[in-house]
Amino acid sequence: MSFDLGNLLQQYAANNPANADQAVNDFDRVAEAAPSAELAQGVSQAFRSDDTPPFPQMLGNLFGNSNSGQQAGMLNQLLGSIGPGVLSSLAGGVLGNMFGGNHNQQAAPQITPEQASQLSPQQVQEIAQQAEQHNPGIVDRMGEFYAQHPQLVKGLGGAALAIALGHMAQGMRRN
């Protein structure tokens, strides 16, 4: 696919909300051509933006649109940022019940796809909220994770995608 990535991204440099409708289509093209690290930074900025829903809500929505393998991957990133001591109280105690209280207290347990599919988007929102409180860097880790799954990111909607593309355009200007 031959196109000028820089010119496409410049359309979003002003974070113009009028670009939101076109952002869904443009995001596909950018996701194919842009370096993964740039895409991750753009997604992270969409997660942090005051113009998008709160980070935990966005993750809950992404979780609900993911397959069980993607859900497990995302949850393992979140849980790894929290630490094992907090796990039993999260998601209404569901996580503690999943592991029967027998998980290694030195490391976060690994969630399987089957276990991930037992959680609701609302429970994931609670986990994401706790993860963000314990480790604000989780927003960047989730940006990196979802940069590997750009089709899921499209589910955030045009406004969030326009923010991600705008941040990527600003990053290209700095480089």
Region locations from a protein language model:
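A structural "flexibility-hinge" signal
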Residues: 1-175
